[in-house]
């Protein structure tokens, strides 16, 4: 008889079935199920090793080591789960103490790591505290020691740790597919809308409900084409309504009916967009933030498609709020899909372009995405007439073909973009990696490869983990057709839907990488940064081919990360001139914000990296106060020829006391008030840099905004 000596000194007879229960719990924690053959092997392995020791009493620590040995042979991931759980009581106390400390800070000080959250609100505080717990659980039960150390030191950054194991990142949601024929949401059946105003209401419900089930940006692609059929239904209704009360003998009744119907539909458009803007900027999602929603538009050329686009642009330009104090809202972010053939001089939708230009010159939005210029995004549109809208502020999907998957089956195969999503991003801190290679006298590419492989492994495990989720976790997406192939049963696992989805390798601080390499900025040189980005592309292409996973290169929009990476660099390598001597690092491949260069120079300099970040990118230039609409138009058209996704940067300011509006204002020149609302570009999206004198932004980002010259 063999006895196991437990931690408290008591004895317990050895029983292989207790091992089965313990390893099954460890497997369940990573959503794995053992086969009977694997269970039999574990029991046999453990029993043989126990009796081979020739002892009648075995300490529990030795028993744990035996079980770990069995699990390492069957499934190393379960072995890690078992190992992590062994000392969970001690670890859990430390973890909860850490969460409690952070929760007190959130409750009484607030949190400015995400400009899209208002941490003064109770619901937001609760969400932020839960996120801290979820983040600790992710680190404890998903990450290995090397990954934890790499994150702690700052060589990599795993985005959205608080939600990565619950759901997916950003998406192009197929709202049109969900609306068609009706759908079920929250156990209630929604009929397909019969009018435009109802379509707006239902679309708003869909967005608020579904955006809360993910953690990244939520895009409604080509919204003008989605809503146009419902505008037609409203139009038909209003024509019939008018004629119903018209005498047949009235001259011009039909023309009057058409005029009446068009006016009524336009009013539905205006009120619908106003409702959407109010809903998205005042009703927080269940995540505790305001849903980060983007709509793309502009390619529709029918009367109602153009009306829907122009209506949103004019509603956004005019702003929301009380009379004399109107200001533009932050959501939805608007992206204009520009095609020179229809938006150029004399084009069928030139009026839509002019409305967009007028809106951009006053509110910064819309941003502009070229469908007719150079490069990957435009080529997909020109060849297939398929639009790659940005997911959220800047993420773009790789092509996935209807029949061939990663590669077209034949010349007739077409790519699918709408309904797809990204499963998460992990970013490289390139200056840190170069500094490490130098401090250890190792080849830079050798060290870089180590972290690229680390990110690769994280993505593969994330795919496996998410694949075990059930469709019921996001029913509108997985069961009602919001995602590509999303007609599963609630009890089905979502693994079959993951193949066409992307996973991102992010890059930050390319400018600081070049500075650390030879003391020159991207403006002065940039060749080493360019070579590094090409190398990363080549390696990720190899991973993609070997793993059958759509990996993508992403120009990371560092928000709070821009300050964190400086802190991490200084801790390891100190303060280095033009690398870590400011409170922030540069975003992705952008020139440093303090560079005194023209908008055209900035467009050209950043263009070197454009096609090397096809998984996520944006180009923007800052316009001085004296810039007029004509200058903005010239630069937008130039960006469209170059194939860019272009943003207009202005520093908008509004006096909350007298209503005066002026660019770059810190004190109102009319009434002397400092009670201002200021809107600046955070990264790819806009944010309040001041609200009633306070800011939602972190100190590092505010320092960056203060130094902007050419951003």
Where are these regions (language model features)?
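Charged, amphipathic alpha-helical regulatory modules used
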Residues: 1-107, 701-706, 711
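Conformational switch/transducer regions in large eukaryotic molecular machines and scaffolds
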Residues: 15, 33, 666, 684-685
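Conserved catalytic cores of very large enzyme subunits
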Residues: 92, 98-499, 520-522, 526-681, ...
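Contiguous, well-ordered alpha-helical segments that form the cores/surfaces of helical PPI scaffolds
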Residues: 503-516, 534
């Amino acid at each position: 008889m063999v006895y196991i000596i437990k931690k408290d000194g008591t004895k317990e007879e050895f029983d292989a079935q207790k091992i089965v229960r313990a390893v099954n719990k460890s497997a369940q924690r990573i959503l794995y199920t053992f086969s009977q053959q694997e269970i039999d092997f574990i029991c046999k392995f453990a029993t043989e090793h126990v009796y081979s020791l020739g002892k009648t009493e075995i300490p529990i620590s030795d028993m744990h080591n035996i079980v770990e040995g069995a699990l390492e042979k069957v499934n190393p991931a379960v072995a890690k789960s078992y190992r992590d759980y062994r000392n969970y009581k001690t670890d859990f106390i430390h973890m909860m103490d850490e969460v409690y400390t952070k929760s007190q800070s959130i409750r009484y000080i607030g949190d400015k790591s995400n400009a899209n959250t208002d941490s003064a609100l109770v619901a937001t505080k609760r969400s932020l505290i839960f996120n801290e717990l979820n983040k600790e659980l992710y680190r404890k039960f998903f990450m290995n020691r090397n990954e934890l150390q790499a994150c702690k030191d700052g060589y990599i950054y795993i985005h959205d740790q608080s939600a990565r194991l619950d759901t997916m990142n950003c998406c192009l949601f197929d709202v049109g597919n969900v609306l068609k024929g009706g759908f079920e949401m929250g156990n209630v059946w929604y009929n397909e809308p019969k009018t435009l105003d109802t379509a707006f209401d239902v679309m708003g419900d869909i967005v608020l409900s579904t955006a809360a089930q993910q953690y990244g940006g939520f895009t409604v692609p080509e919204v003008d084409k989605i809503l146009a059929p419902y505008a037609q239904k409203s139009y038909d209704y209003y024509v019939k309504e008018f004629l119903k009360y018209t005498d047949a003998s009235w001259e011009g009744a039909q023309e009057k009916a058409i005029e009446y119907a068009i006016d009524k539909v336009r009013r539905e458009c205006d009120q619908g967009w106003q409702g959407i803007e109010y809903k998205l900027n005042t009703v927080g999602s269940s995540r505790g933030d305001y849903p980060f929603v983007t709509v793309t538009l502009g390619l529709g050329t029918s009367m109602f498609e153009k009306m829907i686009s122009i209506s949103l642009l004019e509603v956004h330009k005019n702003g929301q709020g009380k009379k004399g104090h109107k200001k533009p809202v932050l959501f939805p972010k608007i992206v204009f899909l520009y095609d020179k053939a229809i938006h150029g001089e004399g084009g069928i939708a030139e009026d839509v372009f002019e409305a967009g230009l007028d809106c951009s010159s006053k509110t910064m939005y819309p941003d502009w995405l070229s469908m007719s210029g150079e490069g990957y995004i435009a080529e997909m549109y020109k060849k297939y007439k398929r639009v790659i809208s940005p997911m959220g502020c800047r993420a773009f999907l790789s092509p996935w073909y209807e029949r061939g998957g990663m590669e077209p089956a034949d010349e007739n195969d077409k790519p699918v973009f709408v309904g797809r999503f990204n499963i998460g991003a992990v970013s490289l801190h390139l200056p840190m990696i170069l500094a490490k290679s130098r401090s250890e006298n190792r080849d830079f590419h050798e060290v870089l490869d180590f972290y690229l492989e680390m990110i690769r492994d994280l993505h593969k495990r994330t795919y496996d983990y998410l694949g075990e989720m059930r469709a019921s976790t996001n029913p509108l997406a997985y069961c009602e057709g919001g995602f590509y192939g999303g007609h599963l049963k609630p009890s089905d696992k979502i693994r079959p839907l993951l193949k066409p989805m992307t996973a991102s390798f992010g890059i930050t601080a390319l400018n600081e990488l070049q500075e650390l390499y030879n003391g020159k900025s991207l403006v002065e040189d940039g060749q080493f940064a360019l070579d590094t980005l090409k190398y990363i592309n080549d390696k990720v292409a190899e991973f993609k081919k070997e793993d059958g996973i759509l990996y993508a290169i992403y120009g990371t929009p560092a928000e709070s990360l821009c300050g964190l990476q400086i802190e991490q660099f200084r801790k390891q390598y100190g303060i280095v001139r033009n690398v870590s001597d400011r409170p922030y690092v540069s975003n992705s491949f952008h020139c440093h914000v303090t560079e005194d260069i023209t908008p055209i120079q900035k467009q050209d300099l950043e263009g070197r990296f454009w096609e090397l970040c096809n998984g996520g990118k944006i180009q923007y230039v800052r316009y001085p106060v004296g810039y007029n609409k004509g200058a903005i138009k010239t630069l937008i058209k130039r960006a469209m020829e170059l194939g860019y996704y272009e943003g207009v940067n202005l520093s908008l300011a509004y006096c909350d006391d007298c209503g005066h509006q002026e660019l770059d204002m810190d004190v109102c020149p009319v009434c002397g008030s400092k009670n201002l609302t200021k809107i600046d570009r955070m990264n790819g999206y806009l944010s309040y840099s001041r609200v009633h004198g306070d800011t939602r932004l972190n100190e590092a980002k505010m320092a960056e905004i203060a130094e902007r010259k050419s951003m």
